[in-house]
């Protein structure tokens, strides 16, 4: 359980992140459920609660006070309770309402992926996909209640729907409508029966001031539609009222706004004081209409009253507790009400909130009052709220008035500085030079994405129109461009990548110092500040001619050279800073950092004077400023934080990363934190002074080892210390008296005397110090310090004892030394290995490949070797690889397992590829138990480690000076696997693994029996052979050496029959055929008889003159090795390497009987179907070996079966070459049918007559029927 606990990061509750617990639980749930499945329910609950940070655990413990033992709760119930306490409490209806309010403001405030993920998470969290039509109707119904008069009804109906959801009740739109009607009726009835309290009984908040108003009301005069103040906006834009959230008008013309709604009826009447601004707080009267706004704070919805004049945001204590009671900080400044009285607050806390769908972080102040005020500290963070506030602010502060006055004055007096367009510095030019040995580099243009092509074209045209760049046709230097999107505007900026082209490395540095933050802040002393921003600052400085030749960019439109200084040039910042420093030299209260210029003064008059002098310089140098980015006469400005009359303070946006930073856990994180903290400490007033008293001296404890070492170095033990402490030590002082007075008793009475009497002849007293021989007896109080001195340099026990026996002595000195060394951390951490324990070898498995040991060897010449050793047989598999990743390892093991099967257990070390999730998943899927050895202790996996050593030495011997390859590895493996192993009782690993001896080159030395044993066919082979022959109508075929044949020759995917000659035979079915000038090995099925040359012809096995010229069905005697005809039959083996040249005695007898059959016999063994011979046209005479025809004209039988079908050769029962008188003269022709009749009556009209054109199958069937 401790291992699981260490693998889980502790959860710390943060009110600003209500979804943090949900994400933490989802990330670690499998660890609790699957990895902790063997734990009991109580142990799992302990593990879960143990992973909570201390303050988070106490919060949970406080919420479960009614339960005596929180660990007795089940794991699932504990998860439910934790989710309820630390999870988001927003209801499903509220989540659905907020889901449709998500927006990406201005398209810039949120990353693309974050915005997409937020939409996906919101849709899943609100369960929109599971909503029925009734739920959608109710949802849209409630969403449409947005008018101010429907706020209470909407809140009531949402509570009604949520209560129904908890009860699992299915609501319809009609039910919500009925409940709405009930609420309206109750609301109207409550107005009728309610009694309006008197004016004096009304309670007024502290920050509200009641004013006297005229109670007499007049009927409002209908006003005409006034022209909106926003008519200058773009056409087509629909105005939105900030006050009532309706579209079609602005807040200044809103009828619901009491400041504007009854203007027609209040003309000429004096208005009471509606708001008073004191220290930034807006104080409103009781009768003023209030506008409320709901804001999501820390994942919970909070209703605020909008206060556009308040500089801070306030919440009540009850609301603060609802948010989870985030820790409060002390308020660093004074807060007062409108009447000047101070306002008491509990403190402030940093929270996260959402405005218009965008999340922000800012302080909120907690007070005892019930009203929550939404001030400008939050509103100004949202761009939409800032623009809306500009419409309803009805009072302008003094600073804003002065800022407007100064801006108008400067624009009137210096129109050239505020003029549109790009300025040009007339006093200075930028000069850049390269090193003398610099080699120009011309880089090609980078492709521009099609989506950005239009924007890049527009920017290049703008720069060309402004005179910044001009096209050229030739340049030695050229750099590609980089397109950057500007923050806030969405426009792009085209910059040159001079680093890529090598120009920055070749340019000489500009040695002008840049001002530090201390230099800038030292000049900013005052109460009034202005901030000036130059328009396209760098582009206002012109380059000289030599620099223009260097600043060249290569674009998709060609090459351009810069006429003005651009971003990306290495000396540009220093060069521009030099020009700006020269321009503002002599001006007090002006600080410049590149293009940011800050002016400070103690009064508005002095500030105005400095501004005039500065703008005179702008006019003289030709610089122009951007009026939109300038700020005049401000109380504070933002520059590396906030700068105001009180000094500088950090910006909360910039310090968010530091506030949310976790406690440092290593040196690098600590250095980063200290650097940031040191920078922020400079913004603290009097940070160099200590807040509390600091102790500079302490009294060290005698029991502290570290303190003793300090004392030891400062004050080593001396003779004086020994003498002084000996007098106070009871044992030493007693012995000193005995020695001085020589008062030893024959029979000691005390324990001290009994112990020291044995040393009385060796004891002596010198200058008040007791010695044993030449060793000083150290008192009890100094023994520990002396031990420290003896252990200086950290000697071992033996050396320390030898050293001590030369100087000191006391009772138990040896045991103290031993304990000192054993408890010294430095000595133990750097000690030798302890004595080994008895060997505990792995048990031998019962069968091979049950347990395997794996490891990696290498690298050897850039390659690694995966070693797999069987624990039973020592059989090894080695795979050569260049990668040792988990994926590669699994692939190699799967290849090995496909040969030997899956083992039961795998033993390996703790390599990352062997302890990865993928490897564990592979073992689990195959039912393999994976065990790992101890870390950095290879002996636990000794089988693999020993073989790795054998493998390395063996490969090194084989390869010599060469590199490792598969051929060398195979040589080693065949040698190792067939070498007797001592652990296998002299057997080889291969013999034990496979159960047989494998054949090697050494097997050639052993004599073998030359008698060839013909293996018999198995029953399965016989059945397969029988069905194959029956299905394909197999027939025996034989060819002789030097016989002319047709052989099938393949060319790619095509084949062709060509002339060939049999030159050699291999076994029973393979022949070597000469085709032209080359030899080809062919199967008997790829050869056909070639007729026309009768010197060598195909011989039917049943009519062969040699009874051994064919192979019988069941084998037989061995064929002679001469050039006799080689015949294959249905019974021939298909093994091409074993040429079957054997025939059976049965076939011999049958052949002899056929050849010796008497003429005219009609025995069933005779076959009267005779195959006609084919005589050559050059020999018209009748060949005795062929049947005699009636006509001497040579006739060829019509080939109806194709060239690939062999004509059946049959016998009439008489030997070939018989005369016509022996066969009979009754052969006549009748159309295409031939009828054979002989002189023997028994042969006339028999069933063996041949029918011309008859198919092979029909003829064979007819013959088979005759035989039956």
Curated annotation (Swiss-Prot):
One of its GO terms (biological process) is DNA integration. The keyword Translocase does not apply. Pfam families: Asp_protease_2 (PF13650), DUF7083 (PF23309), Integrase_H2C2 (PF17921), rve (PF00665), RVT_1 (PF00078). Residues 1127-1143, 1160-1169, 1222-1249 have a biased composition (Polar residues). PROSITE patterns: INTEGRASE, RT_POL, ZF_CCHC. Residues 223-235, 1257-1268 have a biased composition (Basic and acidic residues). GO terms for cellular component: cytoplasm; DNA polymerase complex. SUPFAM superfamilies: Acid proteases, DNA/RNA polymerases, Retrovirus zinc finger-like domains, Ribonuclease H-like. Residues 844-997 form the Integrase catalytic domain. InterPro entries: DNA/RNA_pol_sf, DUF7083, Integrase_cat-core, Integrase_H2C2, K02A2.6-like, Peptidase_aspartic_dom_sf, Rev_trsase/Diguanyl_cyclase, RNaseH-like_sf. Keywords: Metal-binding, Zinc, Zinc-finger. A zinc finger (CCHC-type) spans 239-256. Residues 191-235, 253-273, 1092-1268 are annotated as: Disordered. Residues 465-644 form the Reverse transcriptase domain. Gene3D superfamilies: 1.10.340.70, 3.30.70.270, Acid Proteases, HIV Type 1 Reverse Transcriptase, subunit A, domain 1, Ribonuclease H-like superfamily/Ribonuclease H, Zinc finger, CCHC-type. Residues 191-206, 1208-1221 have a biased composition (Low complexity). GO terms for molecular function: enzyme binding; nucleic acid binding; zinc ion binding. This is Uncharacterized protein K02A2.6. It comes from Caenorhabditis elegans. The lineage of its organism: Eukaryota, Metazoa, Ecdysozoa, Nematoda, Chromadorea.
């Amino acid at each position: 359980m401790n291992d699981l606990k260490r693998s889980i990061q502790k959860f710390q509750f943060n009110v600003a992140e209500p979804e943090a617990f949900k994400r933490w639980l989802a990330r670690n749930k499998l660890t609790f459920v699957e990895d902790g499945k063997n734990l009991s329910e109580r142990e799992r609950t302990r593990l879960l609660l143990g992973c909570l940070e201390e303050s988070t655990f106490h919060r949970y413990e406080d919420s479960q006070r009614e339960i005596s033992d929180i660990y007795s709760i089940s794991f699932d119930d504990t998860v439910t309770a934790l989710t309820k306490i630390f999870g988001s409490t927003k209801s499903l209806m509220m989540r659905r309402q907020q889901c449709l309010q998500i927006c990406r403001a201005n398209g810039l405030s949120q990353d693309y992926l974050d915005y997409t993920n937020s939409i996906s998470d919101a849709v899943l969290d609100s369960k929109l996909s599971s909503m029925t039509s009734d739920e959608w109707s109710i949802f849209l119904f409630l969403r449409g209640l947005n008018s101010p008069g429907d706020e209470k009804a909407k809140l009531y109906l949402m509570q009604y729907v949520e209560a129904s959801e908890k009860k699992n009740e299915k609501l319809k739109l009609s039910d919500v409508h009925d409940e709405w009607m009930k609420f309206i009726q109750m609301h109207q009835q409550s107005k009728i029966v309610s009694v309006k309290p008197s004016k004096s009984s009304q309670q007024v908040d502290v920050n509200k001031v009641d004013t006297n108003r005229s109670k007499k009301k007049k009927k409002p005069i209908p006003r005409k539609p006034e022209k909106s103040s926003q008519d200058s906006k773009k056409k087509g834009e629909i105005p939105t009222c900030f006050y009532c959230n309706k579209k079609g008008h602005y807040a200044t013309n809103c009828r619901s706004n009491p400041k504007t709604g009854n203007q027609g009826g209040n003309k000429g009447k004096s208005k009471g004081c509606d708001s008073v601004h004191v220290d930034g707080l807006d104080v409103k009267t009781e009768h003023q209409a209030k506008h409320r706004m709901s804001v999501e704070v820390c994942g919970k919805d909070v209703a605020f009253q909008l206060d556009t004049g308040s500089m801070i945001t306030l919440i009540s204590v009850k609301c603060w507790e609802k948010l989870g009671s985030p820790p409060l900080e002390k308020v660093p400044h004074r807060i007062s009400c409108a009447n000047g009285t101070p306002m008491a607050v509990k403190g402030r806390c940093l929270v996260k909130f959402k405005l218009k769908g965008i999340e922000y972080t800012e302080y909120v102040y907690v007070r005892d009052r019930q009203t929550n005020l939404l001030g400008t500290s939050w509103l100004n963070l949202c761009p939409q709220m800032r623009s809306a506030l500009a419409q309803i602010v009805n009072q302008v502060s003094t600073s804003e008035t002065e800022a407007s006055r100064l801006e108008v004055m400067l624009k009137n007096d210096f129109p050239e500085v505020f003029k549109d367009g790009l300025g040009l510095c007339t006093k200075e030019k930028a000069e850049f030079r390269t090193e003398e040995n610099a080699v120009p580099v011309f880089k090609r243009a980078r492709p521009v994405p099609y989506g950005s092509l239009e924007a890049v074209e527009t920017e290049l045209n703008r720069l060309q129109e402004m005179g910044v760049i001009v096209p050229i046709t030739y340049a030695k230097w050229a750099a590609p461009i980089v397109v950057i999107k500007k923050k806030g505007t969405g426009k792009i900026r085209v910059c040159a990548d001079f680093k890529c082209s090598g120009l920055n490395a070749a340019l000489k540095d500009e040695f002008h110092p840049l001002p530090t933050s201390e230099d800038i802040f030292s000049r900013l002393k005052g109460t009034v500040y202005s901030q000036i921003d130059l328009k396209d600052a760098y582009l206002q400085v012109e380059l000289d001619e030599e620099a223009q030749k260097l600043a060249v960019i290569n674009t998709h439109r060609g090459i351009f050279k810069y006429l003005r200084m651009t971003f990306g040039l290495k000396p540009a910042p220093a060069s521009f800073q030099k020009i700006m420093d020269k321009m503002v030299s002599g001006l007090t209260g002006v600080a410049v950092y590149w293009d940011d210029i800050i002016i400070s003064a103690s009064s508005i008059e002095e500030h105005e004077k400095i501004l005039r002098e500065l703008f005179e310089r702008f006019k003289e140098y030709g610089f122009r400023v951007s009026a939109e980015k300038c700020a005049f006469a401000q109380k504070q400005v933002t520059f590396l934080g906030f700068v105001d009359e009180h000094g500088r303070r950090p910006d909360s946006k910039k310090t968010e990363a530091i506030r949310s930073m976790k406690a440092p856990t290593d040196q690098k994180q600590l250095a980063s934190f200290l650097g940031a903290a040191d920078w922020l400490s400079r913004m603290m007033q009097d940070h160099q002074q200590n807040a509390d008293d600091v102790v500079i001296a302490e009294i060290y404890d005698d029991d502290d080892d570290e303190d003793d070492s300090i004392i030891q170095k400062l004050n080593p033990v001396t003779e004086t210390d020994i003498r002084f402490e000996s007098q106070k030590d009871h044992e030493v002082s007693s012995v000193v008296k005995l020695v001085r007075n020589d008062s030893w008793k024959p029979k000691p009475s005390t324990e001290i005397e009994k112990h020291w009497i044995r040393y009385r002849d060796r004891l002596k007293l010198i200058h008040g110090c007791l010695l044993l021989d030449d060793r000083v007896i150290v008192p009890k109080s100094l023994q520990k310090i002396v031990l420290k001195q003896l252990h200086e340099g950290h000697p071992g026990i033996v050396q320390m004892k030898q050293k001590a026996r030369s100087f000191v002595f006391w009772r138990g000195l040896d045991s103290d030394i031993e304990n000192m060394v054993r408890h010294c951390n430095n000595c133990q951490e750097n000690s030798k290995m302890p004595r080994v324990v008895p060997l505990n070898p792995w048990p031998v498995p019962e069968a091979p490949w049950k347990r395997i040991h794996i490891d990696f060897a290498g690298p050897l010449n850039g390659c690694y070797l995966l070693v797999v050793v069987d624990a039973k047989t020592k059989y090894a598999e080695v795979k050569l690889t260049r990668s040792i990743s988990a994926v590669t390892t699994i692939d190699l093991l799967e290849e090995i397992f496909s040969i030997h099967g899956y083992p039961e257990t795998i033993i390996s070390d703790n390599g990352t590829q062997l302890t990865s999730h993928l490897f564990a998943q592979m073992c689990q899927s195959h039912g393999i138990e994976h065990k790992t050895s101890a870390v950095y202790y290879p002996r636990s996996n000794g089988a693999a480690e020993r073989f790795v050593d054998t493998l390395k030495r063996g490969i090194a011997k084989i390869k010599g000076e060469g590199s490792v390859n598969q051929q060398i590895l195979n040589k080693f493996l065949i040698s190792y696997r067939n070498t007797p192993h001592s652990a296998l009782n002299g057997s080889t690993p291969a013999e034990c693994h496979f159960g047989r001896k494998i054949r090697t080159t050494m097997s050639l030395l052993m004599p073998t029996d030359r008698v060839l044993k013909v293996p018999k066919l198995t029953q399965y082979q016989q059945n397969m052979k029988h069905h194959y022959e029956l299905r394909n109508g197999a027939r025996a075929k034989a060819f002789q050496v030097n016989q002319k044949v047709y052989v099938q020759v393949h060319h790619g995917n095509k084949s062709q029959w060509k002339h060939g000659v049999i030159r050699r035979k291999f076994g029973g079915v393979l022949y070597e055929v000469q085709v032209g000038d080359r030899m080809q090995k062919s199967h008997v099925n790829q050869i056909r008889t070639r007729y026309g040359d009768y010197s060598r012809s195909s011989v039917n096995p049943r009519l062969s003159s040699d009874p051994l010229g064919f192979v019988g069905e069941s084998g037989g005697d061995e064929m002679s090795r001469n050039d006799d005809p080689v015949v294959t039959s249905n019974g021939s083996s298909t093994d091409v390497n074993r040429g079957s040249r054997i025939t059976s005695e049965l076939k011999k007898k049958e052949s002899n009987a056929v050849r010796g059959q008497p003429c005219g016999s009609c025995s069933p063994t005779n076959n009267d179907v005779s195959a006609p011979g084919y005589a050559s046209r050059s020999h018209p005479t009748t060949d005795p070996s062929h049947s005699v025809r009636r006509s001497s004209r040579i006739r060829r039988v019509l080939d109806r079966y194709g060239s690939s079908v062999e004509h059946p050769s049959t016998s009439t029962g008489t030997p070939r070459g018989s005369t016509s008188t022996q066969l009979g003269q009754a052969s006549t022709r009748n159309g295409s049918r031939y009828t054979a009749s002989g002189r023997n009556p028994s042969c006339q009209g028999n069933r063996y007559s041949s029918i011309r054109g008859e198919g092979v199958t029909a003829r064979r069937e007819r013959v088979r029927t005759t035989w039956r």
